[in-house]
Amino acid sequence: MGMPVRLGTMAMVGALALGAMTGTLGCKKLLKGRGNKGTSTTTTPTATAKNTNTPQDDADEAMQEKLDGYIICLNTLSSPVHATRSRYFSWVNPKTGPTGQERVVLGLFDLPNDKVAKCTSGLAKSKALPPKDAKLEAAGDDFARTVTDLDVIIDEVFTYYENKNFKDDKFAKGKAIHPRLIAAFSAFSKADNNLHSTLDGITKPLSQRALARIEREEGKKFRFHRKHVLLTARELVEAGDPVGEDDNVDFALYNASFGELDRALTDLQSYGLLHKNDLDAQTNPAWPLAKSNFDQFNRAAEDYRKKAREYLRCLRDAPPKARSANGKVDPDKIGPCNDGRPRDVVQKYNDFIHTSNDHQFP
């Protein structure tokens, strides 16, 4: 499965997508996607290849199974938490808290019902699966603890503002609970970034090995090109929405990443023109939908490439005030750009990942 992305400073980006394990882990601020399908078909080798498994193949398959719970949890909760945080900060100064003088009181969003409990349960199950990975498991534990603590506070704050209780106590509770809410948001953000980073360190090499395995067992056919497009798409969206304190965009990296996606997608399209009849073979696991699924995958990938190219122009033509000496570009200082916005790139990436997860073609 693929993993959508979170949008950083611009909005909410989607999610990691299970395919992320196999090559579509998401970015930072929006965690895009919510339940994605197709995990097994993304990376699982064909039945005839099972007897050729190397010890590394077996280890990778075990790790992929272990990662599912971690990725599902991130996809389910990271984006909603960032959304409710943005909602709250849209009308409250995070440093001072509510003053009671606000013209508009929006409160915040509640988290999805029972999602935190399901998430933490899934993390516990994944933790028990082999192989042991102390860093991953510690990151998962920290994520579970901080999101559970945050959920309790969010429920309390949501009810307070939803029922307009601030009209009765003149914002007394809103002012009192603000420091706790900020501390909980901060703790979660650290845990969220840490789990993202930890998963990133595992899934990227795992994805590269999966791609090499496909080439070893099948050659550069549809499965290889599909996987390659997903991998390069992930690298590009991450280059355009960096995680961490320095979230300025490295133009050289984004430009190179776009070139990789451009070539990978062109290779898939070229192969498809020559071998599209192979998709109609009844031996294809996705038959009789393979050809239609290929077309939908290709359209979604093309839409993503178009938006990514438009954003590339914005970065390339950024005004001097948005550029730093190290070649990075601050998206917040670019100003209006008719060619594209970072949130559009992330949205198209998330759309692409959802399409990919739902439209397997082999």
What are these regions (language model features)?
Residues 178-304:
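Extended amphipathic alpha-helical interaction segments
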Residues 256-362:
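A cross-kingdom marker for long, charged
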Residues 84-98, 126-133, 154-168, 202, ...:
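Secondary-structure edge/capping motif, primarily at the C-terminal ends of alpha-helices
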Residues 11-22:
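Bacterial N-terminal signal peptides
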Residues 25-30:
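Bacterial signal peptide processing site
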Residues 38-105, 175, 209-245, 358-362:
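Immediate post-signal-peptide N-terminus of mature secreted/exported proteins
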Residues 57-175:
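N-terminal Sec/ER secretory leader and immediately downstream segment
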Residues 1-12:
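Bacterial N-terminal signal peptides that target proteins for export
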